[in-house]
Regions:
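Terminal accessory/targeting
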Residues: 1-88, 105-110, 114, 233-309
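Acidic helix-start/capping segments at beta-turn-to-alpha-helix junctions
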Residues: 124-125, 183, 189, 272-276
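Active-site beta->alpha N-cap acidic-glycine motif
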Residues: 50-157, 161-170, 177-178, 272
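Surface-exposed helix-capping loop/turn segments at secondary-structure junctions
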Residues: 171-177, 261-264
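Short low-complexity, flexible loop/linker segments enriched in glycine and/or proline
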Residues: 130-133, 156-158, 219-222, 279-283
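Active-site beta-loop-alpha junctions enriched in small/polar residues
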Residues: 94, 119-121, 145, 184-186, ...
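Alpha-helical scaffold elements lining the catalytic groove of polysaccharide deacetylases
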Residues: 99, 148-173, 187-233, 246-249
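Structural recognition of the beta-strand scaffold that forms the well-ordered cores
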Residues: 87-90, 114-118, 139-142, 179-183, ...
Length: 309
């Protein structure tokens, strides 16, 4: 049912946009070398425009993705890097202009940073929104092109979904994105984990699923998230920036996190993802506003400065 709803939602989002496209690796980088242990120093309190009591970011974590480490205790238990009351905000399946921008505005009002796992079709269809995410200081990871269950696909097709999404997102963002990946439906396989490890791409599951795809009303969504968070005490929170009620709930959710003493941790990568030339070539035409072989959107090359648009 979730797959049907998501396919319909992404399909609807693309109307009017151009067609755009449990075991981890044997060895992991040492957490103490990745700057992601609980002992990592807190971020100095930053001023937040027009909000002296902003939630802000308590800690920035840099992840060394060598070997493709896995995070999120629902699937991967190698790294317990969060302190009590620390939360990582993550969003899947976007960007979608209206809802993603509403979420970005709420995050900006509280000077909070998040990680967005983008779907290639929407990243390519709305590169301006993806660049807004990047400009806001958030981290961009990938989530395939069309959101299939990769565990059910032949290896080469699954590999293409991963690599094309990396190429599209990097092209749309204007620079290589983070080597962070989340499996659609959180369905991995040993073969795909091994492949991602060979590509030095970290894999993210979750500690707390908001189940916002079931479309609870904003107040109910906030109550569910806070209740589960209070039980767990900390965690990587999974949400979706294509969900209207998630966008509506975001300002109050951030207030609830602050009121209950939770702190935000921002995930960053030690180095950006390395795209593969083969897939860069295959996806040249899959980003709106880009000519083949051009790394700049048309709007950044030709701009009307007087007269009618």
């Amino acid at each position: 049912m979730r797959a049907i709803l998501l396919t319909a939602l992404i399909g609807a989002a693309m109307i009017g946009a151009p067609h755009a496209l449990n075991a981890g690796p044997a060895e992991y980088p040492d957490p103490s070398q990745a700057g992601m242990g609980p002992s990592s120093p807190p971020v100095a309190k930053q001023s937040c425009p027009n909000n002296d009591d902003a939630l802000g970011v308590a800690r920035v974590v840099e992840i060394d993705t060598t070997g493709g480490p896995g995070f999120g205790f629902q699937h991967y238990k190698a790294y317990d890097f969060l302190n009590p009351k620390e939360v990582v905000l993550t969003f899947d399946d976007g960007p979608l202009p209206t809802h993603t921008r509403t979420i970005l505005a709420a995050l900006a009002a509280e000077c909070v940073k998040a990680t967005f796992f983008t779907v290639g079709q929407l990243a390519g269809g709305y590169p301006d929104v993806l660049r807004q995410i990047v400009k806001g200081g958030h981290t961009v990871g990938t989530h395939t092109v069309k959101h299939p269950n990769l565990a059910k696909l032949p290896m080469e097709k699954a590999k293409a979904e991963i690599e094309k999404s990396v190429s599209i997102a990097s092209r749309a963002a204007g620079a290589p994105v983070a080597p962070f990946f989340r499996f659609p439906y959180l369905r991995d396989s040993p073969q795909l984990l091994k492949y991602l490890g060979s590509r030095n791409i970290a894999v993210f599951s979750t500690d707390l699923d908001s189940f916002d795809f079931k479309r609870p009303r904003p107040k109910r969504l906030i109550k569910n998230i806070m209740s589960n968070l209070d039980k767990k005490g900390k965690g990587i929170l999974l949400m979706h920036d294509i969900q209207p009620n998630t966008a509506k709930a975001m300002p109050e959710l951030l207030k609830a996190l602050k009121a209950n003493g939770y702190k935000i941790v921002h995930l960053t990568a030690k180095a950006p993802v390395v795209t593969l030339a083969e897939y860069d070539k295959l996806t040249e035409k899959d980003v709106k506003g880009f000519a083949a072989g051009n790394q700049r959107p048309i709007s950044s090359v030709v701009r009307t400065i007087s007269g009618d648009q």
